[in-house]
Amino acid sequence: MNLRFLNSRKLINIIEMAAQLILQIYHRDNFMVEIKEDKSPLTEADKKANEYICNQLTSIYPDIPIISEENKNEDYEKRSKYEFAWLIDPLDGTKEFISRNGEFTVNIGLIHLGVPVAGFVNIPCTGITYWAIKGCGAWKKKYNEEDSIMIEPRGEDGIRRKKKIVLASRSHMNEETVEYISKLGGDVELKNVGSSIKLMWIADNKADIYPRLAPTMEWDTCASDAILRELGGGCHIYFKEIVIGGGGGGSGGVEYLIYNKECLLNPSFIASVD
């Protein structure tokens, strides 16, 4: 597999411009909110960012299909033939966007035969883009700054905290998640944050583990998963009968999330970096 066709600067520019479109609407006094068939909210920002990202990707990479939260996606008979595909969540954390707490992201992931091989995640309210292309390391870049800074894999010399920082969703803290956290052992500090920011905190070594034992869609995780995998971790499937003590992303029978399945719903997973 050759990923040299990917232009990281162009992709960073796309996600940064989408973030700016979102912020223009975010800073208005008010904006329209619709309710989709699945009861989730949809704003003008979701629509504008999605349209911009899809148009830009189609212009630069016309042969790569797009799977997006805000598009009518092809049925599986056609999708199953995709070699490469973009998975896009133009505004992850729409509820956070509406509540104006700043905890929302833009997500562009690329898969190859179901495996995430590139990911770009922007946090509009901080201006930071995290990104990775398989085999090229993981990076972060501040808006209006020219260069990206490499995120060092943790390895043997990585920062080790006395407390294990565990992340949880603001709106999906269920009994199974509470039970899982209680079995981790040691000194645990629980933090709540919205959207794929949780996964980027793990990538940036600001947290250790994120158990997601509630529904998510493939476009919610693909970009972040690609970044975590480049750091030696990832989103691995959670099996209740196995008590995982905060590891993951390594060997030993760990099964990672796969993408472009017939059903685009993710199983429960644990995100971490060894």
List the predicted regions and their residue ranges.
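N-terminal subdomain of lithium-sensitive/metallo-dependent phosphomonoesterases centered on the IMPase/IPPase/PAP
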Residues: M1-L91, E179-K183, V243-G252
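Residue-level signal for inorganic ion chemistry
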Residues: A18, I22, D46, L57, ...
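Acidic beta-strand-loop-alpha-helix segment within the catalytic core
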Residues: I108-M200, G246-D274
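Glycine-rich active-site/cofactor-binding loop and its immediate structural neighborhood
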Residues: Y82-C125
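Conserved beta-strand termini and adjacent loop/short-helix elements that scaffold enzyme active sites
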Residues: K36, E69, S169, V193, ...
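Oxyanion/phosphate-interacting regions
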Residues: M1-N13, A19, E179-L184, L199-D274
